[in-house]
């Protein structure tokens, strides 16, 4: 049969393995880097027979994203085998590849600790050196149950029984047997660079009612340099951890015994957040948005109407008032629909752009809560645009322009992913084509590139995801632009067209920064706590050498505050070096030292948080420096900063 491999057509004999088919098509050096393949898009082991209907075979290389994922998944199996050898009686559960590595959950008589990792790694090295092949066996569910019952693996038995299919696949490597869909790398020697990172507790199946397991995290790469770079990134991420910096900078705290997953904003953190919120409101007003706000509690019936009750209620909080059931809002869209519906709209009234810094609550399991990055109460910079179909592309262009300006303001590089129609969806082909083409056209008009994520749109419409890269190369998803065919129909939203008839508007959900809590967490780590001068809670701090300069320092503070700047004066009876060090740890941009010479000259000695000394400056010069520093990032996006 004729099969296309890397753009060339080859005659592949029936019954041959994927390995042999690729070996005949690729150079020796290239073939050695292949870890699996895709036949007509289906991932397969290299030992698998090429299916009879195959027209295309795509090699999966070790250093590709898919190849690295396979290496990590196989490394999880290797780790589980090592743990079983070192700790007799341990029970294995699940061990997937994840974004930056892999993990495996174990049930043992005691929790694993970081002290165990070195021994596990050493045993893994032996297994890697042995080059045990990964072999796949398919069997019935009953056979798999009997297999794992005989091994005493109760967790695997439970998983098998929950699988709806009649047959399952099992992989063997060395002495280890695991239930797995596959595919896997050819043998254990392909895991050339790995490292075990940490241990944690995890409930079986994420349910707090189940047994607590020991989760061991690790990572693996195709080559040692990539692993070294990743480990450096991990160390840098620890230094930038927003939870540590939040405490160091006195921005926020959590009290898990009182309100798990909910933030206590301290004065400086609240000031930073307020500066951000005020900026967002002003920027949206400039761009034609209207400020709105909906209630926190809505009757259950409205959540049933919107579809949230059927599809999202496990993530919602409910209460009863006067015998009526209410849901605490997990999203802002329903209220915005009702605000739109409060008036009969004309085609001349569209588009309507409604913006809300809306507080929402979502029930997240305690095991996934993580500082500001995963919380139960958060604020979204949420907007909903209702427009005519002919206005859709222009509205998306406007949203992309806002994304571009805000990401540029904060110094984030980003990429755009467009997700298209999934198998299960609502709406006509015409609606989907028009919406998808509007997204693609808007991105093209903005002069930006994009990738397509086929079939990953929501059931109610296609979407754009904006993925930003931070200062140490980590990727975060922040912005989402989503076309929705469902809610306007469910809430019977209409406008009167030019023909005098009722028409259904198109709806766009969009959030630019997403959760403000999460964004501030990302921002803290991106800047390692050294926030840009325009948003930092304290822009400058005056430090006195002795009490003799206190009056001058307080007067200077008042003068700078009157100029619209955020300035403190530290007049404590402490050594100057101590006060300077404290200001540097708090990452205050401008440290203004006041001694007798400065008082006599009527100025201050200016030091930057990076240690650079700018010498004696007048207060007017200091104010101008801070103003220019604030304006600089705004100039990049053609925006301006207000000191009011």
Swiss-Prot record:
InterPro entries linked: aa-tRNA-synt_IIb (IPR002314), aa-tRNA-synth_II (IPR006195), aa-tRNA-synth_II/BPL/LPL (IPR045864), Anticodon-bd (IPR004154), Anticodon-bd_dom_sf (IPR036621), TGS (IPR004095), Thr-tRNA-ligase_IIa (IPR002320), Thr/Ala-tRNA-synth_IIc_edit (IPR018163)
Any one of the GO CC terms: cytosol
Details of cofactor binding: Binds 1 zinc ion per subunit.
Domain TGS positions: 1-61
Domain of life: Bacteria
GO MF annotation: an example: threonine-tRNA ligase activity
Enzyme class: ligase
Pfam families per the UniProt record, alphabetical: HGTP_anticodon, tRNA-synt_2b, tRNA_SAD
Residues engaged in binding Zn(2+): 333, 384, 509
Keywords annotated in UniProt: Aminoacyl-tRNA synthetase, ATP-binding, Cytoplasm, Ligase, Metal-binding, Nucleotide-binding, Protein biosynthesis, RNA-binding, tRNA-binding, Zinc
Protein EC: 6.1.1.3
Cofactor(s) required for function per UniProt: Zn(2+)
Protein task: Catalyzes the attachment of threonine to tRNA(Thr) in a two-step reaction: L-threonine is first activated by ATP to form Thr-AMP and then transferred to the acceptor end of tRNA(Thr). Also edits incorrectly charged L-seryl-tRNA(Thr).
NCBIfam families referenced in this protein's UniProt entry, alphabetically: thrS (TIGR00418)
Protein name, per record: Threonine--tRNA ligase
Species in which this protein is naturally found: Nitratidesulfovibrio vulgaris (strain DSM 19637 / Miyazaki F)
Phylogenetic lineage: Bacteria, Pseudomonadati, Thermodesulfobacteriota, Desulfovibrionia, Desulfovibrionales
